[in-house]
């Protein structure tokens, strides 16, 4: 048996609908499926980019206080074929967005945008 591929990353969210709206508007993710478990007081929504298998799993636990992300988790990354355009779009939508940056001695090739729960997405220029 061998490992085949990455399936999803789970993000716990305070406001499920606001998070879905962010990932749809900011990156074009689409809701793939939703599972509600009222008896266990949580809902899971899987989002995916069209044609991609990797998903973001948004988990909403009913009545939970805002989550503390901590300092161990940094970010998820996504590729862009229009880095400048996406950076401008994210700023125009009012999202917390950094300017385009580069590693020391390198031209700008990435920036960060933050979702409603404080999770950061690194947007990287596609090669």
Label every model-predicted segment:
Residues 73:
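Flexible, small-/acidic-enriched active-site or ligand-binding loops
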Residues 51-54, 63-65, 83-85:
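Short, charged/polar surface micro-motifs in flexible loops or helix N-caps
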Residues 3, 10-53:
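Core segments of cupin and vicinal oxygen chelate
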Residues 67-70:
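A short, polar/proline- and glycine-enriched secondary-structure boundary/capping micro-motif
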Residues 2-4, 32-36, 43-46, 78, ...:
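Vicinal oxygen chelate
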Residues 9, 76, 80:
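Hydrophobic adenine-recognition pocket in adenosine-nucleotide-binding enzymes
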Residues 61-64, 127:
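A short, sequence-level motif marking secondary-structure junctions
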């Amino acid at each position: 048996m061998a490992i085949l591929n990455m399936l999803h990353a789970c993000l716990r969210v305070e406001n499920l609908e606001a998070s879905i709206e962010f990932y749809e508007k900011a990156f074009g993710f689409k809701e793939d499926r939703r599972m509600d478990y009222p008896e266990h007081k949580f809902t899971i929504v899987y989002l995916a980019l069209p044609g991609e298998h990797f998903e973001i799993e948004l988990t909403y636990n009913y009545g939970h206080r805002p989550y503390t992300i901590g300092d161990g988790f940094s970010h998820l990354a996504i590729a862009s074929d229009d880095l400048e355009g996406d950076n401008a779009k994210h700023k125009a939508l009012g999202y917390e967005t950094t300017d385009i940056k580069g590693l020391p001695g390198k031209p700008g090739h990435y920036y960060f945008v933050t979702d409603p729960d404080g999770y950061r997405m690194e947007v990287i220029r596609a090669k």
